[in-house]
Structures are given as C-alpha cells and as structure tokens.
C-alpha cells in the first residue's frame, strides 16, 4: 500500500494525516489565526540587539496586531547593526519560551538540496560526500552561473535522483529563490512577512512526494481509519511495539529520552533493540521531537551496537529535518540531535477553545450532510470562541451546508480534542 496523505479540509484550518501501511507517521495542520509566520515564510526583520560573542541577533517581525520577537544565528562575515533590515527565512516555530528562529536570506530546500540567496557556490553535505557522489556536470555549470548570487548544498537525497531530475529541481528552486530575494529587496511593507511558508498539505506533499493524496471533504475516510484515536495515541508516553514490547517516550524541556522495554515479549536484548529502531524514527517525526535525543537501547555488545547505529542512520535518512546521529556513548546510551522546526505535537494538540470549536465545526459539517437540522452541543469555552474569534470560521462552514445546524453551549458537555456531541433534528 502506498503512503497516503489524507486531507481533512476546513477553511484556514486543514488537518493532514500521513499513513504508511495503515500507521500514522506524520500529522500537520493549519492555523489561520496564528500571528507568527509558518516555517518557510520569507520576511524582512528589524535588528534589535547584536550578540557578537555568540553570533546571535535579536530581531522583531511585524505581524497583524503588533510585532513578535525572533532570533537569528549569524552565519559569518560582518555583523549587522541595530536598526538594520534583513531579508530572512523563518526556520522554526517558537518553542519552550524561545522565539521563532530565522535564517539569513532566502532559503528554499527539498530532500535533495538547499538553495540560499548567498553566493558560496556548490557543495556536498558531509553524508552525501561520504558516499562518493559526484555532482552532474550540468548542475556544476548551473552553480558556476549562480556563483555570487546563491549557494547550493546537495543532500543525501540527491543520490536517489537521475541527473535530469536533479537539474530540473535545481533550476526550479533557483528561480524561486531569485524571485523571493527580489521581492524582499523591493519590499516597502515594513518589517513583516513577504511570502507565507507552505501550508499543512503542501508540507506533507513536500516530505512525501510519492504519496497518494486523498481529499476527505466529508470526513468519512478520517472516521473509517479512526485517525483521531491514532493522533491521541501519538501523544501518549507509551508506544506499543510488535510482540508486546513497549517504547517509553519522555519529552521534558531540554532533551527527549526514549527507553525500550521488553514488556510481555520474549525478545532478546539484541532483537528488542532492532525492533525499536524504525518506531523511534517514526515517533520523532510524528511527535515532532527535536533537540537532543537520548535512546536507552538494551545492553548490547560492540558488534550489536555497530549494527544498531547503522540501522538508526538508515532509519532517519529520509527525515525532512536530517537528524545527526552521534552514536553510542561509553555508557551505552545512544544520542542524536534533531533540528527544530515545528511545535511538539502535544503542544499543537492542546485542547484550547479554538481547537474545541474547530472540532465542533467538523462535526457540524458531517452532521449537516445527513440531516435537515441539527444541534451540536459544546462546552462554553468552545461556544464563546465560535461566537467570537471563530465566527468567520463558523460562517464559512455553515454557508456550505444545505441543512441548518445550531451550536448549544452546555456546562455539562465533556469534549475531547476532537469530538463534540450532536443531536439530529
């Protein structure tokens, strides 16, 4: 069965689930009310403070209703001064009390390459160079033409593409970077977003380009596969493995810790370690685990450690954030670092009034397709959102229904992240 991308559309609030052989491996969603720009957005930032000793810059970005803090690590060269305006790309969402992260210039990337609007020519990533890969002559020629304008970094994914496909992607990305860089240079709209980053559906299709895309307008596929239960399970600290073994996943601020437990299985330490590898890689993508990660595999001999290290590197090779595997410590713990980009899944799914209100709208949409009238019962917090900040969402969904659906606030209504109560008339 091919990888499937299931899109549950709602104006400004699409949900996107990615399934591999029936397993949920990634989840994304849009938030049309978010003030902060999405990763991949191009913006102009205003320099506030410069920390030359650690090459960090504190910036401000103009957004609807004010401005937000942002952080930029300076890649080298003469540092800017407070008050300077810079073209930047949003690299990561805010997390753990830290502001959103920026990258200097316009940056566009795919699994095979990174283009930046700074001239450094063509280079291979360390992992790609280790394979003995040689860049096609046509791509080298393109890099020479662009030298001084932008740089190209080829990634491990480049080795999977033929020369013509690689060149076509490079030309497309170079044109995109050039257009965004020109827009940023010409912008007179202040220190804000010039171009928004990819939405949830585009992000999923970018990461899984060969996946089958299913537009689930009625929500039937979402219900049939019980995706809400899968998503709920994805924020549990326990992940069940085949044969009764268990992964314990803890993600406190600072570093994530993943521990394997044989549970009710009869797996040997070596077999348990092998059974952990792919689920660990999938859990990091699905749960959006980033930063330092410590994995407590069962005690292994040196040969088994080498085998598990190679398996981990293979398992994360296609991760869009390209984790760096450090290997086993002398104490037997396995460590890696996964770059930041998105908020952790548990934080994304926190049951806020907005999330509860959106769940009620999805239920109203499903109920409205099979009944002349209906009442969706929601807790007061969700009702207040639907009648306030969420009124535009509510009106957009309701005008697409042939039936009449009303929302009733009830103190006794118990609502999860995903469900409300419905009574059909």
Which ranges hold each PLM region?
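Conserved glycine-centered short motifs in functionally critical loops
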Residues: 55-59, 94-104, 108-116, 243-424
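Structural signature of multi-pass, alpha-helical inner-membrane proteins
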Residues: 43-44, 49, 55-58
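SF2 DExD/H RNA helicase N-terminal ATP-binding lobe
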Residues: 35, 78-81, 287
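OB-fold (S1/OB) nucleic-acid-binding surfaces
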Residues: 59-71
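Extended, charged alpha/beta regions that create polyanion-binding interfaces
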Residues: 1-36, 41, 48, 63, ...
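A generic structural signal for short beta-strands and their flanking turns/coil linkers
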Residues: 41-43, 68, 84, 332, ...
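Alpha-helical multi-pass transmembrane bundles of energy-transducing inner-membrane proteins
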Residues: 69-82, 297
């Amino acid at each position: 069965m091919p990888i499937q991308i299931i899109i549950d559309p709602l104006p400004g609030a699409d949900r996107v689930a990615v399934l591999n052989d029936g397993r949920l491996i990634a989840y994304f969603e849009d938030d049309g009310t978010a003030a902060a720009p999405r990763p991949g957005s191009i913006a102009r930032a205003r320099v506030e403070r410069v920390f030359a000793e650690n090459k960090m810059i504190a910036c401000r970005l103009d957004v609807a209703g004010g401005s937000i803090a942002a952080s930029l690590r300076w890649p080298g060269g003469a540092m800017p001064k407070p008050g300077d305006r810079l073209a930047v790309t949003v690299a990561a969402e805010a997390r753990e009390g830290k502001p959103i992260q920026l990258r200097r210039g316009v940056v566009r990337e795919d699994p095979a390459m990174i283009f930046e609007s700074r001239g450094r020519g063509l280079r291979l990533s360390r992992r790609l160079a280790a394979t003995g890969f040689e860049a096609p002559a046509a791509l080298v020629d393109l890099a020479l033409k662009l030298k001084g304008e932008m740089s190209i970094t080829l990634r491990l994914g480049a080795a999977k593409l033929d020369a013509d496909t690689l060149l076509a992607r490079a030309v497309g990305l170079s044109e995109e970077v050039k257009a965004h860089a020109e827009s940023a240079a010409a912008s007179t709209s202040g220190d804000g977003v010039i171009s928004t980053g990819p939405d949830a559906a585009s992000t999923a299709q970018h990461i899984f380009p060969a996946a089958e895309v299913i537009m689930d307008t009625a929500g039937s596929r979402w219900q049939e596969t019980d995706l809400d239960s899968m998503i709920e399970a994805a924020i549990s600290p326990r992940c069940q493995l085949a044969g009764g073994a268990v992964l314990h996943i803890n993600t406190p601020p600072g570093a994530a810790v993943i521990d394997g437990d044989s549970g009710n299985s009869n797996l040997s330490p070596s077999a348990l370690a092998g059974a952990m590898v792919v689920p660990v890689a999938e859990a990091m993508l699905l749960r959006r685990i980033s930063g330092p990660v410590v994995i407590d595999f069962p005690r292994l001999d040196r040969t088994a450690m080498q085998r598990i290290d190679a398996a981990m590197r293979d398992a994360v090779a296609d991760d869009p954030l390209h984790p760096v595997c450090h290997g086993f410590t002398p104490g037997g713990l396995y460590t890696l670092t996964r770059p930041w980009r998105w908020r952790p899944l548990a934080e994304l799914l926190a049951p806020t009034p907005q999330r509860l209100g959106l769940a009620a709208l999805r239920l109203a949409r499903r109920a409205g397709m099979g009944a002349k009238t209906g009442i969706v019962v929601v807790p007061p917090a969700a009702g207040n959102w639907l009648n306030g900040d969420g009124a535009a969402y509510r009106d957009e969904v309701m005008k697409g229904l042939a039936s009449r659906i009303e929302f009733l606030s009830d103190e006794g209504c118990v609502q999860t992240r995903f469900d409300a109560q419905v009574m059909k008339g």
